């Protein structure tokens, strides 16, 4: 139901056709008109807030590599964005979270265009699949921290140990690659069946997060196609990329 209008002369025609299409499909002529961003960057800012109004950001991550409009490779920090733009996004993310009185871990998502103007999309009030890369570069256990926050611990407590934004440091680079049970020859549609052979990659600077990845596992159509997450870390981005590639090459899934 989305239409891209590149010329002003086409605006009225496309507008009317979209309204007609909406009426037939949903019984309403209501449509939304938004600025079109061509091949934008998808950048997220991770935040963490306690029950006492304290909120910090845990820097950002780039989630632009996608298939079927869903993420498949993420890395942190989002170093291809200019420093001053990133700092503005950090400030806006914290400001928005404070405005709504947000508590716990959350993610604010932005689109960044070719001129590095950024646009807020939405906020996800939960831990996301790609939180791992943020954990690797900050050393903050986001899952543990959100549980402690829910129990009533302030960020400044010895259990969480984030007294101010200055306590959150960004060190090195992390990359996450999602290994999924999908068929790349069929537009990445989810596949099902029994895993006959499973072998994971490993090595220094490699983290694996998985649940159903093992020999004999039955992959059903009732759950997400994500099998395992391979996360690499290094002080140097190119080295982190080499580690990720090696771990992916070592991974074997047959079925």
Give the ranges of each region predicted by the language model:
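ATP-dependent carboxylate activation and anion-phosphoryl transfer catalytic cores
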Residues: 4-255
